[in-house]
Amino acid sequence: MRVLGLNGWPRDFHDASAALLVDGRIAAFAEEERFTRKKHGYNTAPVQAAAFCLAQAGLTVDDLDAVAFGWDLPAMYRERLGGWPHSDSEALDILLPRDVFPRRTDPPLHFVQHHLAHAASAYYFSGEDRGAVLIVDGQGEEECVTLAHAEGGKITVLDTVPGAWSLGFFYEHVSEYTGLGGDNPGKLMGLAAHGTTVDETLSAFAFDSDGYRLNLIDPQARDPEDWDEYSVTERAWFAHLERIYRLPPNEFVRRYDPAKGRVVRDTRRDPYEYRDLAATAQAALERAVFGLADSVLARTGERTLFVAGGVGLNATMNGKLLTRSTVDKMFVPPVASDIGVSLGAAAAVAVELGDRIAPMGDTAAWGPEFSPDQVRAALDRTGLAYREPANLEREVAALIASGKVVGWAQGRGEVGPRALGQRSLLGSAHSPTMRDHINLRVKDREWWRPFAPSMLRSVSDQVLEVDADFPYMIMTTKVRAAYAERLPSVVHEDWSTRPQTVTEASNPRYHRMLTELGDLVGDPVCLNTSFNDRGEPIVSSPADALLTFSRLPIDALAVGPYLVTKDLRH
């Protein structure tokens, strides 16, 4: 079967994406932001991502057996907005406009319940036959948590938690309160390691063996003017935090920055002052999720756990879940957030139509790829000098070993929020100054933000305390004492790191580069962060990579088989 999964709609949506399954295998998968260059793909159908997916597979809409959408939009409109105003044909015209997707007939359109799409993205691509499912996010159609049992290709819902008790919204509201922004929960997670937990209940949570209760908000509270409870929970949490926390909300202001020569958006206080609140919020989140996980594992009798939903991107929480005594195996897809519901919806419909889903494997590289001719044409348009080294991997390794920052744009682009050796900025993991250099000079961001390492899987058991595959940078683990001092730029305050383990099968060129680096510096480990400027999506095309390379103090760019260098001093 050929099933195109979609996420993204013109009203109040984020993370627009498209995924194409052909006979149960991922043929293409991409985020709309990578094409539009507008981060998070807000309030748009995934037109460009869908066009890429079909082009990648050499298909048209007429070749599709089904289109799947990762929300039950008709139910949401009927419940919240007075009725669903579109026929399936009209909805398809919004999602796949005919001027871009000409067709003789419309394929069947399936609206998949949101948490089922999340569950499918984790379970069907895990390679496991059975396990317990835990979905935690901001909110689906109504629920913010789903507990389910996956077995024999079927997903059975056991329990849900209503949206007013959302852990995802709670974490976003705390992030907003600190001045980090509600759409930057990853920053709050990073800040938490610098703080001290004060009271993990926050005078609002009650934790028990089944998860949590929230004494702050009526679980049945509804927002009559919107289709989720974000505003209801925001008002309640901000009022509560102002009562119990020593600092007021960190307000955003506009001020003139002499260094940048323009008016910028900033906060009245340094968000670092809120580090104890960040640590407390992280502890509360973990306590609640651990209870939910233990509950669904006990109720299903399983020891394999599948996790998805936006909260599933919390790598610190995931790393601790992995080591709980109740968990033997755990799978969190690299697209745990709403990016992944296009893939999950496609999988749910494909299974319904009789397909078996192939495991995801150790890669997220399903985006666009560019030929050497296309890369060379982009280079020629810039007028930059470049060359084609006989051993690109060795030269890049030597640059990293000498303290340079290298842009790396190779193969098919990743999908998801993490750069995984396809569109990455690479630096020395051994340099004591590299973290500050990339944070402050290259990426123009907070000094306390951590960086993650890529390392060969063959040495990860020596570097990390947990011997496991970490292909997606979606779990943290502790670094062994001997390596914590050797790899200062990729080890966080609490001696944790969010590793990517690399095998030859998963990424041959990146594996060769890390091998060469190991020969030069002793450890096949490098700092790996996303290749993007502040506030922008990860680069996709050679033109994106070259533009970002020209704007940022990056020393070299390896794009396809070519190497571009410039003389920038740290």
Swiss-Prot record:
Residues that hold carbamoyl phosphate according to the record: R418, A419, R498, N528, T529, S530
Comment field (misc) = It seems that TobZ plays a solely passive role in the adenylation reaction: all functional groups appear to be provided by the substrates themselves, representing an extreme form of substrate-assisted catalysis. The role of the iron in catalysis remains unclear.
In residue numbers, the region (Kae1-like) covers 1-354
Name any cofactors this protein relies on. Answer: Fe(2+)
Source organism (scientific name): Streptoalloteichus tenebrarius (strain ATCC 17920 / DSM 40477 / JCM 4838 / CBS 697.72 / NBRC 16177 / NCIMB 11028 / NRRL B-12390 / A12253. 1 / ISP 5477) (Streptomyces tenebrarius)
One Pfam family in the UniProt entry: Carbam_trans_C
GO BP field: kanamycin biosynthetic process; tobramycin biosynthetic process
Q: Catalytic center at which residues?
A: H14
The entry's protein name is: nebramycin 5' synthase
